[in-house]
């Protein structure tokens, strides 16, 4: 097992309901360390760039609108197999299919307003982290 870093976003549906601390508690209980974190208002340009892989999908504009509808908390998480571990901790994209105790089962409102984003690979984690953090902001 390797120590990895992954990228997380606590989405607007969760920040609106003041769930950052509760979500952080789930993350830390799973053995992941939060080595960088900041609350930001994502711009339309940032959201479009971040979700560019989905630009041809019918839900793209709704996704950009949602992600810019309120503050988000961007994070760098670190730990053993952090990418896979955080995806397990988040739960299935559709909260109806998420396992008990996962972030999405506990806090999500819908498949879109599902409270959290996590990188899907180590490579994408590196790209996503670099979009929001400089190296000197990551203090592990």
Swiss-Prot record:
PROSITE patterns found in the cross-reference section: NDPK, NDPK_LIKE
UniProt entry keywords in alphabetical sequence: ATP-binding, Cytoplasm, Kinase, Magnesium, Metal-binding, Nucleotide metabolism, Nucleotide-binding, Phosphoprotein, Transferase
Residues that, per the record, bind ATP: 11, 59, 87, 93, 104, 114
Protein name in UniProt: Nucleoside diphosphate kinase
GO biological process: CTP biosynthetic process; GTP biosynthetic process; UTP biosynthetic process
Subunit structure: Homotetramer.
Gene designation per UniProt: ndk
Enzyme class: transferase
Catalysed reaction, written as an equation: a 2'-deoxyribonucleoside 5'-diphosphate + ATP = a 2'-deoxyribonucleoside 5'-triphosphate + ADP; a ribonucleoside 5'-diphosphate + ATP = a ribonucleoside 5'-triphosphate + ADP
CC terms in the record's Gene Ontology section: cytoplasm
Species for this entry: Azorhizobium caulinodans (strain ATCC 43989 / DSM 5975 / JCM 20966 / LMG 6465 / NBRC 14845 / NCIMB 13405 / ORS 571)
Cell compartment(s), UniProt: Cytoplasm
One Gene Ontology term of the molecular function aspect: nucleoside diphosphate kinase activity
UniProt record similarity statement: Belongs to the NDK family.
Function recorded in the entry: Major role in the synthesis of nucleoside triphosphates other than ATP. The ATP gamma phosphate is transferred to the NDP beta phosphate via a ping-pong mechanism, using a phosphorylated active-site intermediate.
Cofactor(s) this protein requires: Mg(2+)
EC number(s) on file: 2.7.4.6
Active site: 117 (pros-phosphohistidine intermediate)
Pfam families in the cross-refs: NDK
Presence of the UniProt keyword Transferase in the record: yes
Keyword Metal-binding recorded: yes
Coiled-coil annotated residue ranges, if any: none
């Amino acid at each position: 097992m390797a120590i990895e870093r992954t990228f997380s976003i606590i989405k607007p549906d969760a920040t609106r309901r003041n769930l950052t601390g509760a979500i952080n508690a789930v993350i830390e209980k799973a053995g992941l360390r939060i080595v960088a974190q900041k609350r930001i208002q994502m711009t339309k340009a940032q959201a479009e760039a971040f979700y560019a892989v989905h630009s041809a999908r019918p839900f793209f504009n709704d996704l950009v609108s949602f992600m810019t509808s309120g503050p988000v908390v961007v994070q760098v998480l670190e730990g053993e197999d952090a990418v896979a571990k955080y995806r397990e901790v988040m739960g299935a994209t559709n909260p109806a299919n998420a396992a008990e105790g996962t972030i999405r089962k506990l806090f999500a409102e819908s498949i879109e307003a599902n409270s959290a984003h996590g990188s899907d690979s180590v490579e994408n984690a590196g790209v996503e982290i670099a979009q929001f953090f400089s190296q000197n902001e990551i203090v592990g």
